[in-house]
């Protein structure tokens, strides 16, 4: 892990290359924010339990893999990605896959 003041960077395998990613968490005075939830974050459930807000860069599997570990956290995503984050059907529609 790298620390820069209140910013923690948890390095995934292969320096964060796909599919592991790197987990960035910013600890503020009132809120703890995670940027994306890559595979690397699945090994840091202790940290994820502290997260209040998740900001998703976009809805690819390597950015949302550990989102299920933070049901307590609010999630922010681009307006065009919201349906894909909310349900499996929304994700299928987002990527043009046949509905389940």
What are these regions (language model features)?
Residues 1-46:
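Conserved beta-strand hairpin/beta-sheet module of binuclear metal-dependent hydrolase folds
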């Amino acid at each position: 892990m790298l620390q820069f003041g209140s910013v923690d960077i948890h390095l995934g395998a292969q320096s964060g290359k796909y599919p592991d990613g790197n987990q960035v968490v910013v600890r503020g005075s009132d809120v703890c924010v995670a940027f994306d939830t890559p595979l690397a974050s699945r090994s840091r459930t202790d940290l994820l339990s502290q997260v209040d807000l998740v900001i998703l860069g976009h809805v690819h599997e390597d950015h949302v893999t550990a989102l299920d570990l933070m049901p307590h956290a609010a999630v922010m995503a681009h307006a065009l990605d919201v349906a894909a984050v909310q349900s499996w059907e929304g994700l299928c529609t987002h990527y043009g896959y046949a509905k389940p």
